[in-house]
């Protein structure tokens, strides 16, 4: 169940990321990140009001911090990288995230990944390496600033996930919606804090979009944050964090597939090899 929830979250985010890339290039990375986190905050706030659940306030600061790190800071770097690398190439770096999270989880939660999980991580990284070679052979160079932006995004996203899991270990009974709402609030507060520096023209730039693009960005922001995060936190609450993060290796493959389906790029033999590596890795990931 946790793997299916995590895969669902990755599927939705990968699809949304291909659309976020368009807006990162057309407007800016900081704009699409700020816009989608505001949509997430509104959706989760409304859901929290409707459900009427009261959060455990003693652990609320952890979720606020997690949201600020993962949903605001990490996604700011990722959306900036989208404009430079594209969604698939940016998300491919996420397959290295298990190495960071496994280390933190080992020291904080005593989570020791099994040998099959380690093998899965190896194949996911091989999947990323395959896509990396394609980028280099096609363009003859590495997009260093974009890669660094993506790397910063990974580290901050991993810290956000570890912080969330730490708080859930303190109180496993906290509801998924409360966790999501508090994380979204943390991201929104981060946006308000840094707005004088970022100077994001949230409403003005939105008004400049065509009616069709307004609908697209609203739908992408909703499924890429509200729905995707609900699935992801549900998985984190009941699953092994390192294994779930390893499954994020699916995101570049999924994003690449969506890019092909939407006519943004062409299918290549590298993508086919990456798909095979992913299937092998996924087999070891779910193997007992």
Per-region residue spans from a language model:
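Membrane-interface interhelical linkers
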Residues: 1-31, 35-65, 75-85, 133-151, ...
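Hydrophobic core positions of alpha-helical segments in small-molecule transporters
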Residues: 8, 35-36, 66, 93-96, ...
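Hydrophobic/small/kink-forming positions within alpha-helical transmembrane segments
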Residues: 14, 45, 68-72, 98-103, ...
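Interfacial helix-capping/hinge residues at the ends of transmembrane alpha-helices
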Residues: 16-21, 29, 78-79, 90, ...
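Residues that define the loop-to-transmembrane-helix transition and helix capping
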Residues: 30, 88, 114, 174-177, ...
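Alpha-helical transmembrane segments of compact multi-pass small-molecule transporters, enriched
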Residues: 39-43, 93-108, 122-123, 186, ...
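Hydrophobic transmembrane alpha-helices of multi-pass small-molecule transport proteins
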Residues: 42-44, 103-106, 116-135, 270-287
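Selected transmembrane alpha-helices and immediately adjacent juxtamembrane segments
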Residues: 145-169, 177
């Amino acid at each position: 169940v946790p793997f299916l929830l995590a895969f669902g979250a990755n599927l939705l985010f990968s699809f949304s990321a291909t659309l976020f890339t368009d807006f990162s290039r057309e407007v800016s990375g900081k704009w699409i990140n700020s816009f989608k986190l505001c949509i997430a905050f509104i959706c989760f706030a409304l859901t929290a009001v409707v459900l009427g659940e009261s959060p455990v306030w003693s652990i609320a600061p952890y979720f606020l911090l997690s949201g600020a790190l993962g949903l605001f800071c990490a996604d700011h770097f990722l959306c900036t990288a989208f404009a430079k690398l594209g969604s698939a190439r940016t998300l491919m770096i996420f397959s290295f995230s298990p190495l960071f999270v496994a280390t933190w989880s080992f020291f904080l939660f005593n989570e020791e990944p099994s040998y099959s999980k380690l093998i899965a991580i190896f194949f996911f990284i091989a999947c990323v390496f395959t896509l990396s070679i394609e980028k280099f052979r096609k363009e003859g160079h590495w997009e260093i600033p974009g890669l660094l932006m993506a790397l910063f995004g990974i580290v901050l996203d991993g810290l956000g996930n570890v912080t969330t899991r730490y708080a859930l270990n303190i109180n496993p009974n906290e509801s998924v919606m409360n966790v999501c709402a508090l994380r979204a609030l943390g991201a929104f507060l981060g946006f308000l804090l840094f707005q004088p520096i970022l100077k994001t023209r949230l409403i003005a730039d939105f008004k400049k979009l065509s009616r069709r693009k307004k609908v697209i960005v609203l739908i992408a922001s909703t499924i890429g944050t509200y729905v995707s995060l609900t699935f992801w936190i549900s998985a984190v609450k009941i699953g092994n964090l390192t294994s779930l993060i390893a499954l994020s290796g699916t995101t570049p493959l999924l994003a690449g597939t969506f890019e092909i389906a939407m006519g943004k790029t062409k299918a290549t033999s590298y993508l086919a090899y990456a798909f095979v590596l992913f299937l092998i890795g996924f087999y070891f990931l779910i193997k007992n």
